[in-house]
Amino acid sequence: MKALRAVLLILLLSGQPGSGWAQEDGDADPEPENYNYDDDDDEEEEEETNMIPGSRDRAPLQCYFCQVLHSGESCNQTQSCSSSKPFCITLVSHSGTDKGYLTTYSMWCTDTCQPIIKTVGGTQMTQTCCQSTLCNIPPWQNPQVQNPLGGRADSPLESGTRHPQGGKFSHPQVVKAAHPQSDGANLPKSGKANQPQGSGAGYPSGWTKFGNIALLLSFFTCLWASGA
């Protein structure tokens, strides 16, 4: 009996340190796992920084925002675009009405944009895209926009025509009308211009002979009447 008790006591004493080591091993295992998670987070931050360099310092895109704007009206509203909307869009629509054609302008931020020109139901729509700040400004509101000939869009060209190569105005040439020659080539031979020919001024041709005959007939008639 004493021997059995001694064996049990030895087993109990030897089992306690083993359980303690096992518990210590279980506590020590999570530490390397937590360390690995920290390394993964650092790697993700490095990847995000490499994918978008300088994104923190970049100012957000701003676009003009007007839903319905008529020609000549000013658009005074702007909006800051999110990173998912990198385009400023301008939509111009031309539609026919009872009073003629009506043109409206719409502008805003968008995520995708493609320049198009199409006609839907008698309305022609023109869509333009740009990616710089306030680039979708109405053409009449921007004094820097120039027309293809070199003049500004909000004012007509000055006198003269702009040369396509030199970029300067070339005034039109003045052509003088050639005066008629004074040698009388276009005048009648026997008189001046705008006057009938013949000896009597202001009478048609042959009037002198007819007048003489008429006078003679009148004279003979008077003699016949007096003789009778």
Curated annotation (Swiss-Prot):
Disruption phenotype: Adult mice display chylomicronemia when kept on a normal chow diet, with milky-looking blood plasma due to marked accumulation of chylomicrons in the plasma. Their plasma triglyceride levels are generally above 1000 mg/dl and can be as high as 5000 mg/dl. Mice display decreased plasma levels of lipoprotein lipase LPL. Contrary to wild-type, LPL is not recruited to the apical surface of endothelial cell that faces the lumen of capillaries, but is mislocalized to the interstitial spaces surrounding myocytes and adipocytes.
Induction of the gene: Induced by fasting.
Tissue expression pattern: Detected in fat tissue. Detected on the luminal surface of capillary endothelial cells in heart, skeletal muscle and brown adipose tissue (at protein level). Detected in heart and brown adipose tissue. Expressed at lower levels in lung and liver.
Disulfide bonds: 63-88, 66-75, 81-109, 113-129, 130-135
Pfam name, any one: Toxin_TOLIP
Recorded topology in the membrane: Lipid-anchor; GPI-anchor
Residue positions bearing lipid (GPI-anchor amidated glycine): 198
This protein's UniProt keywords: Cell membrane, Disulfide bond, Glycoprotein, GPI-anchor, Hyperlipidemia, Lipid-binding, Lipoprotein, Membrane, Signal, Sulfation, Transport
PTM comment, free text: Glycosylation of Asn-76 is critical for cell surface localization. Sulfation of a Tyr in the N-terminal acidic region increases the affinity for LPL.
Propiece span(s): 199-228
Composition bias, Acidic residues: 24-49
Residues that carry a glycan: 76
Region of interest called Disordered, as start-end residue ranges on this chain: 21-32, 145-200
Superkingdom of origin organism: Eukaryota
InterPro entries for this protein: CD59_antigen_CS (IPR018363), Ly-6/neurotoxin-like_GPI-ap (IPR051110), Snake_toxin-like_sf (IPR045860), Toxin/TOLIP (IPR035076)
GO cellular component: apical plasma membrane; basolateral plasma membrane; cell surface; external side of plasma membrane; plasma membrane
Localization: Apical cell membrane; Basolateral cell membrane; Cell membrane
Gene Ontology MF, one: chylomicron binding
SUPFAM superfamilies: Snake toxin-like
Description of how the protein assembles with itself and partners: Mostly monomer, but also homodimer and homooligomer. Interacts with lipoprotein lipase (LPL). Interacts with high affinity with high-density lipoprotein (HDL). Interacts with chylomicrons. Interacts with APOA5.
Function recorded in the entry: Mediates the transport of lipoprotein lipase LPL from the basolateral to the apical surface of endothelial cells in capillaries. Anchors LPL on the surface of endothelial cells in the lumen of blood capillaries. Thereby, plays an important role in lipolytic processing of chylomicrons by LPL, triglyceride metabolism and lipid homeostasis. Binds chylomicrons and phospholipid particles that contain APOA5. Binds high-density lipoprotein (HDL) and plays a role in the uptake of lipids from HDL.
Domain text: The N-terminal acidic region is intrinsically disordered. This region contributes to LPL binding. It stabilizes LPL and protects LPL against loss of activity.
Protein's recorded name: Glycosylphosphatidylinositol-anchored high density lipoprotein-binding protein 1
Organism: Mus musculus (Mouse)
Organism lineage: Eukaryota, Metazoa, Chordata, Craniata, Vertebrata
Gene that this polypeptide is encoded by: Gpihbp1
